[in-house]
């Protein structure tokens, strides 16, 4: 017989309350919170760890700080002895999650899915303990379903329920087609939770519909329903859009420490509190104190942002790299001097070359149009002198230093 909270010992009750507060802190929504508490009571009273699921569509494997909001929450469960279920949607990934899309997505090949899944797992090791992760591929069970199984699965949900998705409604309103196979994505994601018997599923707020499918199908298959924890979406460097590589407003966890530090320092002040709470591993009381100091003016926003930048770099590259990145930032931006470790390139090309062509050939910028925009915006300097003419020619000379933006430097030899 399952024990109630009141039947636990005082120390067990204290542990339930501690974990409950930990997991709910920073979450956008817990559905429903009373069931989360009940699951913790059962786990702590029986010594049975909970199974925490995170589903991944391996279509964009570069992990940035936006992804780590959910990963950091997952790590909290892992550190308290619960089982992390990383579900690679190698089967569903070939369909593509239509969430937030105004058109159907290109299907991935098996090779693309496997490569992206491997890349994901390697990067997640910077946040999670990979030795304590259960890695699952949903093709293991979805490939075994026959037509009768699929029809049975489809019969456990209505078309009206599937049409509640905002993106489907928008596409119908815009007279854009919806392929039948797209309806199966949330069905299969929900069925994953049935197979894994997950106790809790994590996701961003944009995954609200999909993760609730797990609860729906677990109930229809007479399983205990999972609790859903939705985490906030992290805005990118522009302070407006959700962090995304396609929006060019992201901080990648594999980026060079100097770039990571510099990008963090470019954040709008209005985002600092959110980043402190969602993107750092500081203790809860440290986070609260730092935010309080910001609000009262006890700490200057610049100093708080430097602490934020140093913390983020330290999390993914270590303390020494964080200190070096801070030193480099101070040297370049606060003392207006050049960094000490400017990479050098042995130039064997023309002695005179169009500035735009030079920037692209050196891979400082990815295209001529991007190089043109950077020059127009005053972001290119040669030996400290700003380049203002998009048609300018560069006269190549030894030890010439090219600066692009605030953080890219290159010396020609």
UniProtKB/Swiss-Prot annotation:
Subcellular location: Cytoplasm
Short motif ('KMSKS' region): ranges: 242-246
Motif ('HIGH' region): 58-67
Any one biological process term the GO annotation gives: tRNA aminoacylation
Domain S4 RNA-binding stretches: 353-413
The keyword Plastid belongs to this UniProt entry's keyword annotation: no
Entry superkingdom: Bacteria
Any Pfam family hit: SYY_C-terminal
GO molecular function terms attached to this record: ATP binding; RNA binding; tyrosine-tRNA ligase activity
Start-end of each Sequence repeat: 89-94, 96-101
Cited InterPro entries: aa-tRNA-synth_I_CS, aa-tRNA-synth_Ic, Rossmann-like_a/b/a_fold, S4_RNA-bd, S4_RNA-bd_sf, SYY-like_C, Tyr-tRNA-ligase, Tyr-tRNA-ligase_bac-type
EC numbers on record: 6.1.1.1
Keywords (A to Z) from UniProt: Aminoacyl-tRNA synthetase, ATP-binding, Cytoplasm, Ligase, Nucleotide-binding, Protein biosynthesis, Repeat, RNA-binding
Catalytic reactions on record: tRNA(Tyr) + L-tyrosine + ATP = L-tyrosyl-tRNA(Tyr) + AMP + diphosphate + H(+)
Entry's Gene Ontology cellular component terms: cytosol
Binding annotation for ATP: 245
PROSITE patterns per record: AA_TRNA_LIGASE_I, S4
Role according to the record: Catalyzes the attachment of tyrosine to tRNA(Tyr) in a two-step reaction: tyrosine is first activated by ATP to form Tyr-AMP and then transferred to the acceptor end of tRNA(Tyr).
Assembly, per entry: Homodimer.
Similarity field: Belongs to the class-I aminoacyl-tRNA synthetase family. TyrS type 2 subfamily.
Protein name: Tyrosine--tRNA ligase 2
Gene name linked to the record: tyrS2
């Amino acid at each position: 017989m399952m024990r109630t909270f009141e039947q636990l010992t005082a120390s067990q009750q204290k542990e339930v309350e501690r974990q409950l507060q930990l997991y709910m802190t920073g979450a956008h929504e817990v559905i429903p919170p009373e069931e989360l508490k009940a699951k913790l009571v059962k786990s702590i009273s029986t010594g049975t760890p909970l199974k925490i699921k995170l589903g991944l569509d391996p279509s964009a494997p570069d992990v940035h700080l936006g992804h780590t909001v959910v990963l950091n929450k997952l790590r909290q469960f892992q550190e308290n002895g619960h089982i992390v279920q990383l579900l690679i949607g190698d089967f569903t990934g070939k369909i593509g999650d239509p969430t937030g899309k105004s058109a159907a997505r290109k299907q991935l090949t098996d090779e693309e899915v496997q490569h992206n899944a491997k890349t994901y797992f390697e990067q997640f090791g910077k946040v999670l303990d990979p030795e304590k992760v259960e890695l699952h591929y949903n093709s293991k069970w979805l490939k075994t379903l026959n037509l009768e199984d699929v029809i049975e699965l489809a019969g456990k949900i209505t078309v009206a329920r599937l049409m509640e998705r905002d993106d489907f409604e928008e596409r119908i309103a815009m007279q854009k087609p919806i392929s039948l196979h797209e309806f199966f994505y949330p069905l299969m994601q929900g069925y994953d939770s049935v197979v894994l018997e997950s106790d809790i599923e994590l996701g961003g707020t944009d995954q609200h519909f999909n993760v609730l499918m797990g609860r729906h199908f677990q109930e229809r298959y007479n399983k205990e329903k999972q609790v859903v924890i939705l985490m906030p979406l992290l805005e990118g460097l522009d302070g407006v859009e959700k962090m995304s590589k396609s929006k060019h407003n992201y901080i990648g966890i594999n980026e060079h420490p100097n770039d990571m530090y510099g990008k963090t320092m470019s954040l709008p002040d209005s985002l600092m509190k959110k980043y402190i709470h969602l993107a750092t591993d500081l203790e809860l009381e440290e986070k609260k104190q730092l935010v309080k100091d910001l609000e009262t003016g006890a700490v200057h926003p610049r100093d708080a942002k430097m602490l934020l930048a140093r913390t983020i770099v330290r999390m993914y590259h270590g303390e020494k790299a964080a200190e070096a990145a801070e030193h480099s930032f101070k040297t370049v931006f606060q003392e207006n001097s050049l960094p000490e470790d400017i990479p050098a390139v042995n130039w064997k090309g023309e002695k005179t070359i169009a500035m735009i062509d030079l920037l692209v050939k050196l891979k400082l910028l990815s295209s001529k149009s991007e190089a043109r925009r950077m020059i127009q915006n005053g972001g290119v300097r040669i030996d400290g002198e700003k380049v203002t003419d998009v048609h300018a020619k560069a006269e190549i000379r030894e030890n010439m230093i090219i600066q692009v933006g605030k953080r890219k430097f290159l010396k020609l030899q």
